[in-house]
Amino acid sequence: MTPSLFERAETFRDRTAIIAPEGVFTYGNLLDVSATVATRLLAGRDDLEETRVCFLVPPSWEHIVTQWGILRAGGLAVPMAISHPSTELDYVLGDAEPEALVAHPKLLDRINIAADRRAIPVLQTPALVADGPVGELPTLLPARPAIMLYTSGTTGRPKG
């Protein structure tokens, strides 16, 4: 059986995974922070059971730990393109029907109205990735869906 992404990351826990303006992050750092993100997303539940969670986060270590956290909680990660105009982001939110939206504070103004209209809770990355307790995470099977990607929508609406 092929090791999962998280098993591989655990194997290389002390190795550098990302060098960013905010610092150097090891695979262990990413695993630890994503476990905290997963715990916060679970909010006392055992498993998100493939519930969709959209996230609008610039390419960064926060993007990685947000995506990993959604996956580790058993959710279906729906990354949103920061290059899309607000109308396309609104469309993706409506089409994906997520339970929650994770957004970077710099991008809130582009998505808040659409999330409010749909009563989708918005979680901001600084609070989500801050140090915190880690709870029991669900066991994930390799065949479980992980990510729902949307096309760029160059010839029409984005498709997921």
Task: List PLM regions with ranges.
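AMP-dependent adenylate-forming
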Residues: P3-T26, G44
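Adenylate-forming
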Residues: R8, L30-S34, V53, I70, ...
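Conserved pre-ATP/AMP-binding loop-to-beta segment of ANL
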Residues: R13, P133-Y150, R157
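Phosphate-coordination loops involved in phosphoryl transfer and adenosine-cofactor binding
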Residues: R15, E49-T51, P142
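Conserved AMP-binding/adenylate-forming
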Residues: G23, A38-H84
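Active-site charged/polar residues at nucleotide-handling catalytic sites that mediate phosphoryl
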Residues: L48, D95-E97, R118
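Short beta-strand elements of ligand-binding domains
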Residues: V57, M80-A81, A103-H104, A119-L128
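Conserved ATP-dependent adenylate/AMP-binding module captured primarily in the ANL superfamily
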Residues: H84-A114, A130-G132
